[in-house]
């Protein structure tokens, strides 16, 4: 990678730390999730939730959203300056579900943001603990990635819906910092940049004046983040062109869309972290586990181990399949929405099916849904094996391109081939190789054409038994080479709407 000297591990970004050694990183990540756990326990006490109610993932999500809203400085400021009817800018809340006489009831609660901030800080040794907030944002983002499709958003920015595997983190808020930037997919960054350029085309003052200077700095920073995700010199050179453009316009949009398409084969490096719902950390803290002392990692065995020993429940609508609901949450917990289903199935130990075959809607329940018919069931979040999360796109041997699939962005560092339909992808690259970036485009297309679907990625990497915490005996799975493994085939999920 380019900036080897200054690169921080994504645990460090997650905890806002400078360079630390492995033990310090484990301790600071442990401190972060321990703080989330303590906060959750305190909120359950405040709300008088029973043990069962506290393990309900819908209650966990409401509590997480409340603390995120309480710390959303920009939105809080905006709400105070633009008072809207029926919204108290100083309060936050949401639905809490309680078990009453064998039925589930919804209760809407409202809290002072100041009070929530106080409880959060108290759980985090008096600090703002921004890292913990980002961690919750990434968990929500991973849940959205597994639940919704972004076809409409892709089409609106002129991209192809088949590029959905590049959209990791597309619902992360802007304020999610370095840890958030690390988990954003190539498509997400391209989309943010295209939106920005389009605003500049429509609003001539966008790049001008004092505000314009700040906008420009943000634009160049986003370009650099995206550049850092690409692994080939030609893709990076194209990003330099886009960044240095005096007056970004349609030519830059074209270049960005070209780069996004190229990332289907020349994949970018996108980090993956297992971020769990707050109630899981709460359960562990309540049972006396000391995260800071034991240390914790988001990319190793720890989250798997935590999920082996946690019982989490979910509300289930009348015609939903509890096993499918479990799969959805399992994928979200391991940030595996864009992983090859063959790999996920092997690790989980039960077959993971494409989203088009799931009989389940999202985890959150809308306020107009009838609670009378709601049931609840245990989420099966355990796994057969564990594997190390990756931040590489799985391109084989360093600089060369490897076969990418039209919809996979590997999560686990496990050996596999990446089957892809080269014809489908290459069809998108006919024609336009003229203009300033022609030599780079030609080079990128050449690399893509030389990629072979039978190449093996993550050579020699395997999964591990849950008893093998030091990762000493890798088990390298063998996969059916022909089997296409994308979660998004035959997709009928609902769109993500804010």
From Swiss-Prot:
PTM annotation, UniProt: Late in virus-infected cells, may be cleaved from a 56-kDa protein to a 53-kDa protein by a cellular caspase. This cleavage might be a marker for the onset of apoptosis in infected cells or have a specific function in virus host interaction.
Pfam families for the chain: Flu_NP
Chain positions of motif Unconventional nuclear localization signal: 1-18
The keyword Ribonucleoprotein is annotated on this UniProt entry: yes
Motif Bipartite nuclear localization signal per record, residues: 198-216
Function, as annotated: Encapsidates the negative strand viral RNA, protecting it from nucleases. The encapsidated genomic RNA is termed the ribonucleoprotein (RNP) and serves as template for transcription and replication. The RNP needs to be localized in the host nucleus to start an infectious cycle, but is too large to diffuse through the nuclear pore complex. NP comprises at least 2 nuclear localization signals that are responsible for the active RNP import into the nucleus through cellular importin alpha/beta pathway.
Name of the protein described by the UniProt record: Nucleoprotein
Lineage, broadest ranks: Viruses, Riboviria, Orthornavirae, Negarnaviricota, Polyploviricotina
